[in-house]
Design a protein with these regions (language model features):
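Membrane-embedded beta-strand positions of outer-membrane beta-barrel proteins
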Residues: 27-29, 43, 55-57, 77-79, ...
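Bacterial Sec-dependent N-terminal signal peptides
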Residues: 1-25, 175, 179
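Solvent-exposed loop/turn segments connecting transmembrane beta-strands
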Residues: 26-41, 64-71, 106
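Outer-membrane beta-barrel "beta-signal"
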Residues: 79-82, 165-179
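Transmembrane beta-strands of outer-membrane beta-barrel pores
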Residues: 31-35, 57-63, 81-83, 96-102, ...
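Repeated loop/turn-to-beta-strand initiation elements of outer-membrane beta-barrel proteins
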Residues: 25, 50-53, 87-88, 129-133
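Flexible, solvent-exposed loop segments that connect beta-strands
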Residues: 58-72, 98-114, 144-164
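Residues that define the transmembrane beta-barrel architecture of outer-membrane proteins
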Residues: 23, 35-37, 71-75, 111-117, ...
């Protein structure tokens, strides 16, 4: 299933790229995710002079000291409205997010999903004709559903839980390359 989704996303991105002209496509990565040892990549496409659409993905497969885990994958699409013009200056956005996670922190095992959305504000600085730096902060909602157990190595005693989260849902300091 993951291969099918990845193939579909790559096909869509390739098809969109074939119809775009210069400075209408950006590939980016979020430095804050890298600080948290989470590889990530995003692509942003101009829809008009003031609107862009972005799709970002992140994946954390690592196991840390003492067999601690915070594994997850995340997808976050976003539509942005630019006050000046695309890829320059202030913007506001609306984003959605979906993720799957597996955690063994705090002597509890949690295995679950989240979905939600929010609004964001950001600013994009032009560094050179092809490089930009973008800062963004988003607030919103996430519905989280997961299985939790006290015993990390076993699955006995699992409890189904749900929670609703309101607060920061996006934080980014990204380096972008514009085509």
């Amino acid at each position: 299933m993951k291969r099918y989704i990845l193939s579909l996303v790559l096909l869509i991105l390739f098809g969109i790229h074939q119809t775009m002209s210069a400075q209408d496509v950006a590939v980016k990565t979020n430095g804050l995710y890298w600080l948290a040892t989470t590889p990530n990549i995003g692509a942003e496409f101009a829809l008009s002079n003031k609107w862009t659409a972005e799709l970002t993905g992140a994946y954390n497969p690592w196991t840390f000291k003492n067999d601690k885990k915070l594994r997850f994958w995340l997808v976050q699409p976003e539509a942005k409205y630019w006050f000046c013009e695309k890829f320059e200056g202030h913007f506001i956005g609306i984003h959605a997010h979906g993720a799957q996670f597996y955690s063994t922190l705090a002597h509890k095992r949690r295995d679950g999903y989240l979905a939600g959305g929010g609004i964001s504000y950001g600013y994009d600085w032009i560094v050179s004709p092809h490089f930009n730096i973008e800062a963004e902060l988003g607030l919103g909602y996430a519905h989280i559903w997961y299985k939790e157990s006290e015993c990390v190595p076993c699955i006995k005693g699992q409890v189904n839980k749900t929670t609703n989260y309101f607060g920061p849902t996006k934080a980014a300091i990204s380096l972008s390359y514009l085509f």
